[in-house]
Amino acid sequence: MDVLLSLLSEFGFERLSSELSLPIVVHSVPGGGKSSLIRKLINKDRRFSAYTFGLEDCESITGVRIKKAHASIPRSEFVVFDEYIEGDTPPWAFAVFADPLQGGPGPVLRAHFIKRRSHRFGKCTAQLLNDLSYEVESDLADVVQIQGLYETDLQGTVVYYEACVGNLLRAHSVPAYYISEIRGQTFESVTFVTSENYPVDRALAFQCLTRHRSSLLILSPNATYTAS
């Protein structure tokens, strides 16, 4: 356990509980470094193995990677699971990781460790997210713009979560992604197109608002995007 606790401290996770029980529950905002922490853990200590209910890692030259979770994972003492909210985690798991703000079908467990700081996007996005009642921090620089649906050109990767928006974009032959198609992916610049002026579905809206690194453009009916 000491090696995991040491890495959690190194990566800036805040401990919430003085008493720990298995599985150790770790929550992070997007870009908080949880996947990087898991990779460092399994490369540093060969006792550990890692599986994810999200996108698995590509094969590596070391042969060590985060693999896709499946029903027949052999029971072992030091197995960790990423994106645990997305699947059925075995009760013998050593530690489980997730970003609960992105939602998922499974229950959210009480966290032993959390990290609110993102190393993906910047202060402008963090401020917008806090205005929308999500707890996120960042020290980086980025740009956020909010415009009307037809007031400016699209930029970067276009994302949406509402079916009516998808139909509109297809009608105009705009290449775009429903948010579940790109879960776990990051892009330099993103345009989020929505038919509403507030996050109707908070989990899906949060995903759309956190796929970028340097630039986010929100297109909404009245050129506003607020908590309600």
Swiss-Prot record:
Protein name: Movement and silencing protein TGBp1
Organism of this sequence: Lily symptomless virus (LSV)
Pfam families reported for this sequence: Viral_helicase1 (PF01443)
Family the entry assigns: Belongs to the Tymovirales TGBp1 protein family.
Self-association and partners: Homodimer and homooligomer. Interacts with capsid protein. Interacts with host AGO1; this interaction targets the host protein for degradation, thereby suppressing the antiviral RNA silencing.
Keywords: Host cytoplasm, Host-virus interaction, Inhibition of host innate immune response by virus, RNA-binding, Suppressor of RNA silencing, Transport, Viral immunoevasion, Viral movement protein
Domain (+)RNA virus helicase ATP-binding: 1-132
Compartment(s): Host cytoplasm
Its biological purpose: Transports viral genome to neighboring plant cells directly through plasmosdesmata, without any budding. The movement protein allows efficient cell to cell propagation, by bypassing the host cell wall barrier. Increases plasmodesma size exclusion limit. Acts as a suppressor of RNA-mediated gene silencing, also known as post-transcriptional gene silencing (PTGS), a mechanism of plant viral defense that limits the accumulation of viral RNAs.
Additional notes on this entry: TGBp1, TGBp2 and TGBp3 seem to act together for cell-to-cell propagation. TGBp1 is the main movement protein that physically cross the plasmodesma with the viral genome. TGBp2 and TGBp3 would facilitate TGBp1 function.
